[in-house]
Amino acid sequence: MSSPTIPSRLYSLLFRRTSTFALTIAVGALFFERAFDQGADAIYEHINEGKLWKHIKHKYENKE
């Protein structure tokens, strides 16, 4: 008897039952959203370096 391959193992663990399939999709969407959002923010901040308020506010704050 041969050992199960990776795709068949994934199918049996994550996609065979509807409940685990839905949970897999929801968790995948959550992680994708977080990664995409952080990546987009990093790119935006890199492109606008020195133009955003958090980069220049030290010039305008009162030092007491």
From Swiss-Prot:
Record's keyword terms, sorted: Electron transport, Membrane, Mitochondrion, Mitochondrion inner membrane, Respiratory chain, Transmembrane, Transmembrane helix, Transport
PANTHER family for this protein: CYTOCHROME B-C1 COMPLEX SUBUNIT 9 (PTHR12980:SF0), UBIQUINOL-CYTOCHROME C REDUCTASE COMPLEX, SUBUNIT X (PTHR12980)
Pfam families (alphabetical): UCR_UQCRX_QCR9
Family: Belongs to the UQCR10/QCR9 family.
SUPFAM superfamilies: Subunit X (non-heme 7 kDa protein) of cytochrome bc1 complex (Ubiquinol-cytochrome c reductase) (SSF81514)
Coiled-coil portions: none
Subunit note: Component of the ubiquinol-cytochrome c oxidoreductase (cytochrome b-c1 complex, complex III, CIII), a multisubunit enzyme composed of 11 subunits. The complex is composed of 3 respiratory subunits cytochrome b, cytochrome c1 and Rieske protein UQCRFS1, 2 core protein subunits UQCRC1/QCR1 and UQCRC2/QCR2, and 6 low-molecular weight protein subunits UQCRH/QCR6, UQCRB/QCR7, UQCRQ/QCR8, UQCR10/QCR9, UQCR11/QCR10 and subunit 9, the cleavage product of Rieske protein UQCRFS1.
Membrane-protein topology: Single-pass membrane protein
Location(s), subcellular: Mitochondrion inner membrane
GO annotation, biological process: cellular respiration; mitochondrial electron transport, ubiquinol to cytochrome c
Source organism per UniProt: Mus musculus (Mouse)
Protein name as catalogued: Cytochrome b-c1 complex subunit 9
Gene3D superfamilies: Cytochrome b-c1 complex subunit 9 (1.20.5.260)
Entry's transmembrane regions: 19-43
GO cellular component terms attached to this protein's record: mitochondrial inner membrane; mitochondrion; respiratory chain complex III
Membrane side Mitochondrial intermembrane: residue ranges: 44-63
Mitochondrial matrix face of the membrane: 2-18
InterPro entries in the cross-refs: QCR9, QCR9_sf
Functional summary from the UniProt entry: Component of the ubiquinol-cytochrome c oxidoreductase, a multisubunit transmembrane complex that is part of the mitochondrial electron transport chain which drives oxidative phosphorylation.
